[in-house]
Amino acid sequence: MPTKVRLGLLLALLAIAPAPTPALASDPPSAATLELARWAETRDARMAWWREARFGMFIHWGLYSPAGGFWNGKLYEQHYAEWIQHWAAVPCAEYARQMKPLFVPAPGFADAWADLARDAGMRYAVLTSKHHDGFTLFNSNAPYSLANPITGGTNISPPGRDLAREFADSMRSRGLRAGFYYSLLDWQHPDAYEMALPAYPRVPGPRDHAKYIDYVRTHVDELLSGYGPLSTIWFDYSDGTRNGEAWGATRLLEDLRTTQPAIVVNNRLYEGLENKNGDYGTPEKYVPPTGLPGMDWEVNHTLNESYGFSAHDANWKDTATVVRLLSDIVSKGGNLLLNIGPDAKGRVPEPAAATLRGVGEWMKVNGEAIHGTTASPFQRLAWGRATRKPGVLYLHVWEWPTDGRLVVPMQGQVRSARLLGHDRDAALAAAPSEAEGGRLVVEVPSSPVDPACSIVRLELDGDPLPMPFLIFPSPDGRLMLTPHDATLEGPSIRIERVGVIGDVTHNIGYWLDPAATATWPVGIGAAQGGNYRVEAEIACADAAAGSRMSFEFEGEFEGGRGTLEFTVPATGGWQSYRRVGLGQVELPMGSHRAILRALSKPGEAVVNVRSLTLRKP
């Protein structure tokens, strides 16, 4: 919503990074453009294993791990404990002096990680070889890593050991692929790009960024040449001023392609979590509502709120939450890279391990609905998600139907239907239903196999034939109308994304022209007709409040109950949302169009809309 310049809009724009500037028709392609094109030529072959895997382990471990989110006894509440040096403004020398003696990896730590990842159904793992503090879990021979006057040296493996090698060997011994995260940002190197952090070493004269880029290239070459075949190099941290050639991206990509031609690389040599200058995008702690069409992508997420070990963050995700997160991401065509933050000895916190063990039990039964699948053919399903393989459709049922009828908005011949984890020989009845407008109805048992997500496997003759998209009430009776399901018509009106990492939200905004409309296709199935109470989650700056709006359904409704009118209240700002009751509407069985329109606009804009919810009283 345009109220001068808003932080939410700025953050949203920062998350969209352009590709390298296209050359004029008369100019030869740049080296960067040519290198990206070479990567694209082999992408499908290199990404085949990654698209099959769908689920991997992220591991944040380093000198920040002993601190656990504390410094000198003070608790730092910020979520990312691996940033403790920044939060506490600790000089590099002091940070190294205190943390190095406390980082004491136990023998066999990597075997325990690999067992946990394998048993959870993960297929690959990525370890922080160097995080922002600049310390290396691999034994680098770069002169600055061997010895330097600031931190004494960046290598932190115990004498006679190489922690990165232990990680890679253990993962491969369990059948997982190993890859490395590498931070382009460096808080200790005197020639690194400087951020506004008190911890940065002050150096006389200007920094020589070319020296730092050579240092980065040396590190990457060591990882590529010394640790066997790697699944990925997971670069981190580009922004508006440090991205692309600021990191020497063309040479780095050429090195990767030359040394390990089968490797895949993420997109963070360039700015923006969803930019296309890599093999896969990297949304962080959020799931794009419609996936990222036209590109591969991987959500990296955490089991609590922090990536690095935090002794005070007990906000652990349970198994059900992770199972649904995985189901959601894979149904939209993405991968999940799920993080653990081991302590200074390499031990995984028990709540995290317990959750992963639970996920592993679910994957033993349902892994075929995750590994090797592609995105759902449906725009949205009221009761859950779906994935597919050739000739097979997997229905991920989050909300079990109380009447024993799972309604699927598709046509096509179903050869067989069964519930994974139930009785393997027990077939489920599945047939189109006239009462449901020709939609497929699968007769399911009275209770689910797993309340978080049960999988119904349909074997098909040919491809599923999704019916025209309609939003139906979920099994609990709620009808949710969201921004990404709407058709927006009119100048300027659009879907806004607010936030970059973590708490990313979307809303309909920039409603500058009162002639604009938002329309949703709604379906009311058999036994779902009746009165629905309507509630809108909306926001409006105080100075712009007072627009008159209508929410109406196309069709004949007795007594005019198909239309509701209301006045947009002041909520305190364009991103300060309130739930506002609009009244009740009667909806008969059938297909309808729900239309939200403005009738007047006294201020700069009409309203921001996060959702409309209809439910029976």
PLM feature spans:
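Short, conserved beta-strand segments of beta-strand-rich sandwich/propeller modules, principally
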Residues: 453-455, 531-533, 591-593
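Acidic/polar, compositionally biased interaction segments
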Residues: 579
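Extracellular beta-strand-rich recognition modules
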Residues: 534-536, 582, 592-598
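Mature catalytic domains of secreted/periplasmic carbohydrate-active enzymes
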Residues: 26-526, 541-555, 559-572, 584-586, ...
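Bacterial N-terminal signal peptides
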Residues: 8-19
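Bacterial N-terminal signal peptides that target proteins for export
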Residues: 1-9
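Signal peptide processing junction and immediate N-terminal pro/mature segment
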Residues: 19-26
